[in-house]
């Protein structure tokens, strides 16, 4: 039976909110909050993959296993691919990528992403989505939208409003029932991860700044389904951080 590991990519120099991995949330750095949330699961191991000695030292101080990676990776998946190679995981194993800025991610969704990849043998990656309930989220580029086929394989991810509803110019007229927000959790087959860094980086990945588009561009399948539980958005801005702080202080 394949082992299932969780890897949390943690980059110190984030663009929109610098040093957010170390941002204080109710007395603990965010990376610790994420680690402690993930530790409630029953997976074989939890590893933090970081390019920062500072994050490494702090993470090890609260008992995390850490892999130090290069600082020139284009995406979290590239960072995880390096970590997986260093850790020597077996090709048949599964790695779940839990973003280091999602301290409120439900454990059920992590388990769901892993099980989906087990069930969908044609896919090399699995991920989750949820229905959009606020029309403003359709036009917010920080909310990545996804469309998928009848067999629950992703067709495209975009920061734009997809699908485009032709003939409707006013937001109030749009039927939002067919719009889905991508949840940034991924499960990968280790054999694929070891190959990921060799794949062609496509123009669409650069335009959208979405690493999962490299998978689709190179002809691989991403399985997707609606999440078991609603997932709060990750921390990308100071406003997001303040919202999470309020939730932890309740």
Swiss-Prot record:
Classification via Gene3D superfamilies: Spore Coat Polysaccharide Biosynthesis Protein SpsA, Chain A
Keyword Cytoplasm on entry: yes
> Which UniProt keywords are present, listed alphabetically?
Cytoplasm, Lipopolysaccharide biosynthesis, Nucleotidyltransferase, Transferase
UniProt keyword Cytoplasm, yes or no: yes
Its pathway, per UniProt, is:
Nucleotide-sugar biosynthesis; CMP-3-deoxy-D-manno-octulosonate biosynthesis; CMP-3-deoxy-D-manno-octulosonate from 3-deoxy-D-manno-octulosonate and CTP: step 1/1; Bacterial outer membrane biogenesis; lipopolysaccharide biosynthesis
**Top-tier EC class:** transferase
- Provide any one GO MF term from the record: 3-deoxy-manno-octulosonate cytidylyltransferase activity
Cellular compartment(s): Cytoplasm
Q: SUPFAM superfamilies annotated for this entry?
A: Nucleotide-diphospho-sugar transferases
The chemistry this enzyme catalyses reads: 3-deoxy-alpha-D-manno-oct-2-ulosonate + CTP = CMP-3-deoxy-beta-D-manno-octulosonate + diphosphate
**One GO cellular component term:** cytosol
Membrane spanning residue stretches: none
Q: Provide the GO biological process annotations.
A: CMP-keto-3-deoxy-D-manno-octulosonic acid biosynthetic process; lipopolysaccharide biosynthetic process
What EC number(s) are associated with this protein in UniProt? 2.7.7.38
What is its biological role? Activates KDO (a required 8-carbon sugar) for incorporation into bacterial lipopolysaccharide in Gram-negative bacteria.
User: PANTHER family from the entry?
Assistant: 3-DEOXY-MANNO-OCTULOSONATE CYTIDYLYLTRANSFERASE, 3-DEOXY-MANNO-OCTULOSONATE CYTIDYLYLTRANSFERASE, MITOCHONDRIAL
Which family is this protein grouped under? Belongs to the KdsB family.
Protein name as it appears in the record: 3-deoxy-manno-octulosonate cytidylyltransferase
Q: Which organism is it from?
A: Francisella tularensis subsp. novicida (strain U112)
Q: Which gene encodes it?
A: kdsB
């Amino acid at each position: 039976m394949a082992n299932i590991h969780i890897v949390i990519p943690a980059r110190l120099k984030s663009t929109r909110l610098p040093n957010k991995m170390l941002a204080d949330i109710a007395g603990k750095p965010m990376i610790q909050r994420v680690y402690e949330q993930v530790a409630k699961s029953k997976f074989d191991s939890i590893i933090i993959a970081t390019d920062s000695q500072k994050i490494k030292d702090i993470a090890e101080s609260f008992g995390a296993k850490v892999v130090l990676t290069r600082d020139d990776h284009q995406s979290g998946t590239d960072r995880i691919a390096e970590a997986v190679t260093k850790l020597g995981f077996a090709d048949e194993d599964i790695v779940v990528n839990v973003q280091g800025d999602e301290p409120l991610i439900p454990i059920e969704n992590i388990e769901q992403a892993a099980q989906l990849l087990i069930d969908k043998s044609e896919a090399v990656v699995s991920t989750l989505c949820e229905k959009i309930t606020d029309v403003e989220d359709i036009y917010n580029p920080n909310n990545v939208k996804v469309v998928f086929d009848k067999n629950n394989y992703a067709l495209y991810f975009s920061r734009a409003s997809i699908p485009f509803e032709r003939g409707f110019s006013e937001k109030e007229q749009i039927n939002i029932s067919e719009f889905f927000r991508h949840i940034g959790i991924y499960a990968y087959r280790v054999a694929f991860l070891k190959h990921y860094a060799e794949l062609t980086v496509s123009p669409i990945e650069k335009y959208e700044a979405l690493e999962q588009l490299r998978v689709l561009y190179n002809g691989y399948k991403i399985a997707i389904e609606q999440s078991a539980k609603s997932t709060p958005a990750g921390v990308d801005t100071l406003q997001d951080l303040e919202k999470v702080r309020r939730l932890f202080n309740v």
